[in-house]
């Protein structure tokens, strides 16, 4: 097939543009689970450690009305830890301080409430025992009082902790079926303690308030002693095991939230890895990116240049006449019906000869006119 029968040069399809660089926001996605963890369920509003929601029972605010002989009634506030299922039983009865009570003479037959006390001396001893120890210990006096209250059949346990700094370091148990009330420190707590130390007969009624289980952290801690809880003098009720290790059971909502955070972290990690791979591939293609862009510009320019078919007289079909124009690239004569490329400088060449030249040089072979711009080359 001769050059005259070749089809006209078509603009080649442009290669796809390089992929856009990854958004910088993708690099911030791994911080999303951390932000969700701080804003989600269990986050502490005061900057302290978030609540873990451990233990089977919920925490509810309570009001304790204490009646003392020949004195005004004392109103105390605190937190009750107990089972959330079903209506809560009404708590009330005589208050007995376990540190000074005589079990054989003062334990009443009807329901009564045990009072456990941790004073400044016990707290100081507690901190001294914990210094240099990697394993957490608890105030021995409080543990002994709680054990004694369980075995003597107390219907509830009232904790008087004058120094509440120990509450953050002490795991407070809901003691199975026996609710625990932790009182907030106030002047009335001091008055109640003074009355109980003087063996003044006091009674209390406990009424519940709204749920605080989402804001307060409580942990279920068991000890290593088992026995039967006594329900007055008439018999034995409930097997109580104070034993072993700390049970850590999270609420279903907290477990679901942890699963959501885990999935979000995995998705964010995958997106970051994909963005890094895409950026790596783009960096590998970067050295040739400018060259490809320049070639596409030259191809578009060639497609816009004029072409024409060579028309010779019949006499010049057989032998070229003297003075017939030639292609300055291949030095061959122009033949009839050949495709010629007409440059902006009006010079003509064989299209198949000058196009490869222009792809490399971008200038007219005769006058050095730059086909990409309206100026002449300095070469």
From Swiss-Prot:
Task: Specify the glycosylation sites in chain numbering.
Answer: 188
Q: Where in the cell is it found?
A: Membrane
* Bilayer disposition of the protein: Multi-pass membrane protein
Disordered: annotated span: 1-21, 44-63
Q: Where are the transmembrane segments?
A: 25-45, 253-273
In the UniProt record, which is one GO cellular component term? membrane
Per the record, what ranges lie on the membrane's Extracellular side? 46-252
What is this protein's record name?
RING finger protein 215
State the organism of origin. Answer: Mus musculus (Mouse)
Gene for this chain: Rnf215
